[in-house]
């Protein structure tokens, strides 16, 4: 949290809840994938949330990652340079986010720049990178490097084609939502509180 003081009360509870969502095992998987995918001497950080954040904070690793998912000459981020200036780092992070959105990640799955730069929500950063990896595996264009089992499998379209005869038969079936004339019924039941009549 670079520019913010400590949070108190409800803000502190919310921040602690967000920090509990961070997964150290997932961090190791993501580091392994990023270093495998980038190949260009990307160093591996020490384990830990802060080290992971500092590794990604300047945006160069993220830009190298998104560029490695595109064919040669079609890289979305043209200029990648390490910088110590805050606005340059944030600009590179936002370039990665724009390129990730063009790659196919939903806007709802993308973290905000401050989530990474200030370390406010590193779990959201992990989710974005997981979605990016899963999408790269699903594309199956030969540009993904690493183990496809690191990421959840994306579902693929599976259309069903029914003949006119099958569609017509489906109209004749009475759905269970309409009710059924079999099974238990209320025949012989008495109202609540009435005594049993034994004859």
UniProtKB/Swiss-Prot annotation:
**Gene Ontology cellular component list:** actin cytoskeleton
Which residues form the Calponin-like repeats?
174-199
Which positions does the record annotate as the modified residue N-acetylalanine?
2
The Phosphoserine modification is found at 11, 163
* Ranges where the Calponin-homology (CH) domain occurs: 24-136
- Carrying Phosphothreonine, the residues are 180
Omega-N-methylarginine PTM positions read: 182, 196
Q: Tell me the Gene Ontology biological-process terms attached to this UniProt entry.
A: actin filament organization; epithelial cell differentiation
The UniProt keywords, alphabetically, are: Acetylation, Isopeptide bond, Methylation, Phosphoprotein, Ubl conjugation
Supply one GO molecular-function term: actin filament binding
PROSITE patterns the record matches: CALPONIN_1 (PS01052), CALPONIN_2 (PS51122), CH (PS50021)
Record InterPro entries: Calponin-like, Calponin_repeat, CH_dom, CH_dom_sf, SM22_calponin
* The keyword Acetylation is annotated on this UniProt entry: yes
Question: Pfam family of this protein, just one?
Answer: Calponin
Point out residues bearing the modification N6-acetyllysine.
17, 20
Q: Where is this cross-link: Glycyl lysine isopeptide (Lys-Gly) (interchain with G-Cter in SUMO2)?
A: 171
* Family affiliation: Belongs to the calponin family.
Q: What is this protein called?
A: Transgelin-2
What is the organism of origin for this protein? Rattus norvegicus
Gene name of this polypeptide: Tagln2
């Amino acid at each position: 949290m670079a520019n913010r003081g400590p949070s108190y009360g409800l803000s502190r509870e919310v921040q602690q809840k967000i920090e509990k969502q961070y997964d150290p095992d997932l961090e190791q998987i993501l580091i392994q994938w990023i270093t495998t995918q980038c190949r260009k001497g990307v160093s591996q950080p020490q384990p830990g949330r802060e080290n992971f954040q500092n590794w990604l904070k300047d945006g160069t690793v993220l830009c190298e990652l998104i560029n490695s998912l595109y064919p040669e000459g079609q890289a979305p981020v043209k200029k990648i340079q390490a910088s110590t200036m805050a606005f340059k780092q944030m600009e590179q992070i936002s370039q990665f986010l724009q390129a990730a959105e063009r790659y196919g990640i939903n806007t709802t799955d993308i973290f905000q720049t401050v989530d990474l730069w200030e370390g406010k929500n590193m779990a959201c950063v992990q989710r974005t990178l997981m979605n990016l990896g899963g999408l790269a595996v699903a594309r199956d264009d030969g540009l993904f490097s690493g183990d496809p089992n690191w990421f959840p499998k994306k579902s693929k379209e599976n259309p069903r084609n029914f003949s006119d005869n099958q569609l017509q038969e489906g109209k004749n079936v009475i759905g269970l939502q309409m009710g059924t004339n079999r099974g238990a019924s209320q025949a012989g039941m008495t109202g609540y509180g009435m005594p049993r009549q034994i004859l």
